[in-house]
């Protein structure tokens, strides 16, 4: 796209062939507000922004902290929060279009990756999850290797990403891996939220250089960036400079220095242009200047010709904003937006999420999750070691418990400890599961796979570890304590442990989906498990529990009560115990658990186990429902919040009086405003612009 003339700065109108190869994104009068329903004014995050992004070019959105960089990026990508309202025009190739999974990709600021996988494994699994199932392994492998080469990851392709116990790739390499995952499906538009944040200058350069290579492939790249080095800044084609939600400059990056010079704020020769731009519009530098002057207040400060030292930042910013509105750059941008809005481009092929089949996704997710569990020391291996140590301790403390009268209490105590406290140890896997949930949320938002396939794959991959925990714990304690002999009793004992541990795992999944915070999740999970143990019939017998609430229904929906009752029946029924006083008849196990512990023996122990299984299924279904509600309720709440906001703003004269919105509020509500939606259904906010 060459310029027609240096004076106009306008590019040639793209042809239909060019349109079919790329995505031209344009926005006009884009405004984002957070309503204040009190007496205070409505807060504007973005104010009537105009701009466009074209294929083959990389745009930088710059500005100080709080200037609206991420808000603008989220507005264009359809990821705005539910408590904000967006108005304006957003056009793709001159018309309304869905910003869908196959069209756009979004790289978040945080690199959400499984640290136990290598770079190649991470990209390969992502490819199998999303690429068409009819593609051969060789074709998928070629795409993976090509992506690795494109992002310059060939030197670290066989190194693990890294986590708390394994050192992995560098921060810049992690960022490039995140970018590689998003460009596997060759999206037309790539959004990035501060990809250079936290990176050194060399790593930041390699990341932006990789983005430049992606843009050259005919894709539209839009990235927010905070304060790039001069070498990194030179890689950007276009610049959108923001301050307090207002446009300070939009145009070619190399022309920004000229604009600042024309406005009376030239960039010194040896100063980084991006540093100079931020110095002009960042009010924090006023405090720095005042501090420097204050430290030299004893000496007479000589007059300086530097306008940055003589003018307040608010004055500089206001002058820049006004100069830009009247500049040739703003006129050129509006003219280009008009051209792009009148383009009759070709319809773009949009893929609806992943193109892999459900079964392929299940196999891929199960394999990836199983490898992650095998390599993550804290997921299951540490717990297995703890279970072995605790099982040996329990077995030796209750060794050969016997059949005396005192052994009754010993058997009950041992069974209650195994059912309650040993299953409580499953809470130790919560941190690792929380990290996996972060990956799920990120991939689900990008349309990799569905909720059901994730839940099923997680249980299948964890099944061997849960079996190992149950068999190891059951074998050690059963043989050392010498519970009732017989293989069927041993099998029931192990199954009871297996399903009890599975219930706790499922409960912690529900907690993680509702309270996705490490510390609060542990506290919540521990509290719930504590209630389950208190109502299990071990600390207080079930018949003695208060009938209201605790007995009915809490004890019936507590897996602990069913697991303990089944354990008592499995161990006591068929045994006889010595009486308290010599000469009295022996006590049968049935009398002990029914008369002493209040356990009904009218139904089989297998029904108790079936109740535990039913609770397990209910927790898994609840996990599914919570995830779906989070997913489905988000867009609905956004729409409700948007309508409520616009109704309230319509009655707010302070909102109408602001000069930044030239259109009436009723016009915005009826013609321009659309409900805020998720990325899968965010549409352009209007038909082509009419002048």
Curated annotation (Swiss-Prot):
Membrane topology classification: Multi-pass membrane protein
Residues modified to Phosphoserine: 664, 670
Biased composition (Low complexity): 660-669
Signal peptide segment: none
GO cellular component, one term: membrane
Region (Disordered): 657-691
Residues that bind ATP: 63-70
PROSITE patterns according to UniProt: ABC_TRANSPORTER_1 (PS00211), ABC_TRANSPORTER_2 (PS50893)
Listed transmembrane segments: 384-404, 414-434, 453-473, 491-511, 514-534, 548-565, 607-627
Keyword Repeat: no
Location within or outside the cell: Membrane
Keywords: ATP-binding, Membrane, Nucleotide-binding, Phosphoprotein, Transmembrane, Transmembrane helix, Transport
All residue ranges annotated as the ABC transmembrane type-2 domain in the record: 360-572
A GO molecular function held by the record: ATP hydrolysis activity
Residue ranges constituting the ABC transporter domain according to the UniProt record: 25-269
PANTHER family on file: ABC TRANSPORTER G FAMILY MEMBER 11, ABC TRANSPORTER G FAMILY MEMBER 15-RELATED
Family listed: Belongs to the ABC transporter superfamily. ABCG family. Eye pigment precursor importer (TC 3.A.1.204) subfamily.
Name this polypeptide is given: ABC transporter G family member 15
The species this protein was found in: Arabidopsis thaliana
Higher taxonomy: Eukaryota, Viridiplantae, Streptophyta, Embryophyta, Tracheophyta
Gene symbol of the encoding locus: ABCG15
